[in-house]
A protein has these predicted regions:
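Charged DNA-binding/catalytic regions of mobile-element recombinases
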Residues: 1-165
Length: 165
């Protein structure tokens, strides 16, 4: 369910505690993490995989905005070709304006504070499982947000869908 004012918010890449790159796609309407990926490197393939998982999950309409900062992975020809091939529109933060990426920065801050800070993982798979658990079992179904009336992303979307029926 979307409001029609729906866009995915693609963050800068971030090195996680397990020395992996992590990328997410967040639906700005509900604050739900709708796509994510982890790789050994923070590269174009990482952000493509994060958005591709959102495309598979949500099947957005053509013209859906994908917002990012101005990092090199988001200005590459591969990135732009990927977006165009899926009917997605690139939107970028203004240079030096961190506020455009606030929802994603907030998510990564919560992930670090609530789950991965001061933890070490014996394997990459263990780190990936921890991130999966946080996103799919806690953040999306249970983590409340002030921007959604203190509802979790899943509950916010459920209530929105009920209003439309």
């Amino acid at each position: 369910p979307t409001s029609g004012k729906h866009r995915y918010h693609q963050p800068r890449t971030l090195n996680q505690a397990a020395t992996q790159g992590g990328g997410t796609s967040i639906d700005l309407f509900s604050r739900q993490v709708v796509g994510w990926a982890m790789r050994d490197r923070a590269d174009t393939e990482l952000v493509v995989q994060a958005v591709l998982s959102a495309v598979w999950r949500r099947k957005p309409n053509a013209g859906c905005l994908v917002h990012s900062d101005q990092g090199s992975v988001y200005t590459s020809d591969d990135w732009r070709s990927f977006l165009a091939s899926h009917g997605l529109v690139c939107s970028m933060s203004r240079r030096g304006n961190c506020h455009d990426n606030a929802p994603v920065e907030s998510f990564f801050g919560l992930l670090k504070r609530e789950r991965i800070r001061r933890r070490t993982y014996p394997t990459k798979d263990a780190a990936r499982a921890e991130v999966f658990d946080y996103i799919e079992m806690f953040y999306n179904p249970n983590r409340r947000h002030g921007s959604t009336g203190d509802l979790s992303p899943v509950e916010f979307e459920r209530r929105y869908a009920q209003r439309g029926s």
